[in-house]
Regions:
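Core of compact, soluble alpha-helical bundle domains
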Residues: 1-125
Length: 125
């Protein structure tokens, strides 16, 4: 069986931890105000959807697709103004979340590149 990013990260528990740390950072940092502003007050739904999406995106169970169908990331994010600032704030939070989890440096490097490519694709401004 393939050694996916999902497995290398530590599976379901670690993906959930990454998502929770990401949103905790986004919710508490003073330098991510613009990113936080495009989210609902209650982040529960966002946490669940990102967890389900990342599970499949990282090579684990395709939870998001099973529940909602194809992610259509860009289309689903089109109602929100996403520019370089929001992309960079998103990357700051995911990068810090990975560092806080003490993930293997090589895996962080690989994930950072993949996250950046996706985050940059989401820009619509």
């Amino acid at each position: 069986m393939e050694n996916t990013h999902y497995k290398r990260l530590g599976g379901e528990k670690s993906v959930r931890e990454l998502v929770d740390r990401f949103y905790d950072l986004m919710d508490s940092r003073s330098d991510t105000h613009e990113l936080r502003a495009i989210h609902a007050v209650d982040l529960s739904d966002a946490r669940d959807k990102l967890f389900m999406f990342l599970s499949g995106w990282l090579g684990g169970p395709s939870l998001y697709i099973e529940k909602f169908g194809h992610p259509r990331l860009r289309q689903r994010h089109m109602p929100f103004s996403i520019g370089e600032l929001e992309r960079d704030q998103w990357m700051t939070c995911i990068s810090q979340a990975m560092q806080d989890m003490h993930i293997d440096k090589e895996l962080i490097k690989e994930l950072y590149a993949a996250f950046y490519k996706t985050a940059d694709f989401m820009r619509n401004q």
